[in-house]
Amino acid sequence: MSSGECSNVQLDDHRKNNLEIDEGREFESKEEAFEFYKEYANSVGFTTIIKASRRSRMTGKFIDAKFVCTRYGSKKEDIDTGLGTDGFNIPQARKRGRINRSSSKTDCKAFLHVKRRQDGRWVVRSLVKEHNHEIFTGQADSLRELSGRRKLEKLNGAIVKEVKSRKLEDGDVERLLNFFTDMQVENPFFFYSIDLSEEQSLRNIFWVDAKAMHGCRPRVILTKHDQMLKEAVLEVFPSSRHCFYMWDTLGQMPEKLGHVIRLEKKLVDEINDAIYGSCQSEDFEKNWWEVVDRFHMRDNVWLQSLYEDREYWVPVYMKDVSLAGMCTAQRSDSVNSGLDKYIQRKTTFKAFLEQYKKMIQERYEEEEKSEIETLYKQPGLKSPSPFGKQMAEVYTREMFKKFQVEVLGGVACHPKKESEEDGVNKRTFRVQDYEQNRSFVVVWNSESSEVVCSCRLFELKGFLCRHAMIVLQMSGELSIPSQYVLKRWTKDAKSREVMESDQTDVESTKAQRYKDLCLRSLKLSEEASLSEESYNAVVNVLNEALRKWENKSNLIQNLEESESVTAQDLPIHEEQNNTYDMNKDDNVADTGQEYSLQEVWKVTALQEQRNRYSILDDYLSAQHMSHEMGQINSMASNRNGYCSVHQNIHSLQGQSITHPRLYETEQSSFRPEAMYERLQDMVKDLN
């Protein structure tokens, strides 16, 4: 036997020794446990399947799983019943008239049972290693090769099936576009984008509701750990904070470091300690490289990429990031679980669109119901804590339920002061959490009322943790500092939705004005739709405002048309030697000019009288009107000065119609019918 063969045999023996399973062994997830059991089965010489799994009725998450030898059970049991002796729901072997003959059942009892703990980790509860049939110890490699080939064939088939299932049917594109068009009619800022292949297969659909961000860029963006996404976010949202999902980043460990994890059981725990146990960036860097060097992985390319992108996912680098409920450590299934209620795997595209709208509508109704409960129902206090009493009056019912869990959890925490900086009112505590079986570091600055905990619950969820509250209580504080009460979780959260345009000047562009009005309309629609009375009141106000604006628009249009008429059709009267020839012909001409001037004012006056209310605000005081008319009367006081009066009338005509101040808000008190009456009186006096 060559040295290479000897080393391979020794490596296989070493791997088998490290693949031994005992009760109490822990895993990060159900998938990791199953992958480990498959490796164990391959090393021993048998194959395994997932026989059963169970979800929690409360949360819908997996809490139990059972992996068995493929010869587990008997043919009769599999065909006749779907319930195992241990209470799990076991899939029946008979499907669509066929019997599963993939392997011979020998009623083998070998299995592995894992269960999910409260902290999310999975632990081995029970197992049976003995088989009642022959195992193929010498054919483990062949089994692995065969298993890999079957997986590849199964994967290829699934891909083909998925591609076929995504091909659009006749009318689907039209339905989709109609759906998006209707959404845009309801909400002008609704955005969508469709990506189709050359074969008319659907590749991607993207749409977003305008109410999600009110037209503002996102402050924080969470994505998977991907370099292309990293570059894309930097290009599109350069000022947003980009973070990676921790569940995705660390979830790649079994794949990237599986060969090391199987040999070194403490690797995962030590990496987690370096990530979560570091209070400063310097501490993390030191602890990280100690772990990497201890397990001789400094040359690992994947770990190098994680370290280079540490500011995107390591908690200690995200102290300034407020995720406000978005979780990076665990995958959020809220959207998927919500859709599962309305759609199934075989749901048609048309049915999906209908069910999606139904889901959104029910979500809105649930939010309205929750708002009503918050306003009219007081949450029950389960603790005499002053923090609980304080926030019961401030938080919404749903948020207070979450907050009260932390209040009650404070009884399991024991704080101990570690240090205090001289000259600065800053103290550091180490809080032992006996419920989570971990210790956390809390820093309290009494001068600035700033409290920071290494668990980072406030940054992740938006409310203070039990560790921070126990330190506040120990320091004599009886209320939570205001900076740790986010308004988005309070009863008056709606009042925060003040448009930015209320505080800053709207840019004088049509697009900006249109955007501002749409945002205001959205807010008004949300409030007015709460009751029929508010709806009717708002509709009446909107109709009245629309009529007023139409009348104002018509008036301005008439003034502009009058300006055009006087500028083009009325000749300019030229005077010579400051004398006025009062012969008949000139009188006729003057009458024509006088009539044109009257017509201009009459059209405007009749328009305003027909509208029955003043379009231009009546801000002009009596003194201002008297002063202005006094000037006109003074011009007419001397009958021999009729010529100059007539000139001033023409001057007034041109000035009144063409002067830009007519269209300014500050001159909106100008009343054409009043001026027309004054001009008539003045002409009578002259005659």
From Swiss-Prot:
**Where do the FAR1 domain residues begin and end?**
35-137
Q: Give coiled-coil spans as residue ranges.
A: 540-562
Keyword annotations of the record: Coiled coil, Metal-binding, Nucleus, Zinc, Zinc-finger
The SWIM-type zinc finger ranges are: 440-476
Q: Name one GO molecular function term.
A: zinc ion binding
Q: Which GO terms describe its biological process?
A: regulation of DNA-templated transcription
GO CC term (a single one): nucleus
Q: Which Pfam families match?
A: FAR1 (PF03101), SWIM (PF04434)
Tissue specificity of this protein: Expressed in rosette and cauline leaves, inflorescences stems, flowers and siliques.
Top-level taxon of the source organism: Eukaryota
Q: Does the keyword Flavoprotein apply?
A: no
Q: What InterPro entries does this protein map onto?
A: FAR1_DNA_bnd_dom, FHY3/FAR1, Znf_PMZ, Znf_SWIM
Q: Where in the cell is it found?
A: Nucleus
Report the sequence similarity comment from the record: Belongs to the FHY3/FAR1 family.
Cited function: Putative transcription activator involved in regulating light control of development.
Q: What protein name applies here? A: Protein FAR1-RELATED SEQUENCE 1
Per the UniProt record, the source organism is Arabidopsis thaliana
Q: Which gene is this protein's source? A: FRS1
